[in-house]
Regions:
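Active-site-flanking beta-strand signature of metal-NTP-handling nucleotidyl enzymes
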Residues: 2-8, 55
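A structural boundary/capping signal
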Residues: 8-10, 36, 63, 74
Length: 92
């Protein structure tokens, strides 16, 4: 089962692309280290206070993949200075 999690993030404290980069790098690095998934910024690269992330993982069981995506979402939501403005999941 392939799980895709698309996230729309709001970074209200970012006043420049440099301000945006630090928390995003932290999120990308932490998710890659803690979970066996791929993650990338896929939208709003030139917007200071918005980011679109995509997370893709593979597992033999959908329930296990859902659990992993839930953990990732929770970790991102707990990141200081980052607000999750929307999420969408797809199963392939």
């Amino acid at each position: 089962m392939i799980g895709l999690l698309e996230l729309e993030l709001h970074l209200p404290e970012a006043q420049s692309l440099k301000d945006k980069r630090q928390p995003l790098r932290s999120i990308l690095s932490r998710v890659r280290q803690d979970h066996n998934v791929s993650i990338a910024e896929v939208a709003h690269q030139d917007d200071w206070q918005r980011a679109g992330l995509a997370v893709v993982g593979v597992n033999t069981e959908r329930v296990a993949m859902e659990r992993t995506l839930d953990l990732i979402l929770r970790a991102i939501e707990e990141t200081p200075g980052v607000v999750c403005a929307g999420e969408q999941r797809q199963w392939l």
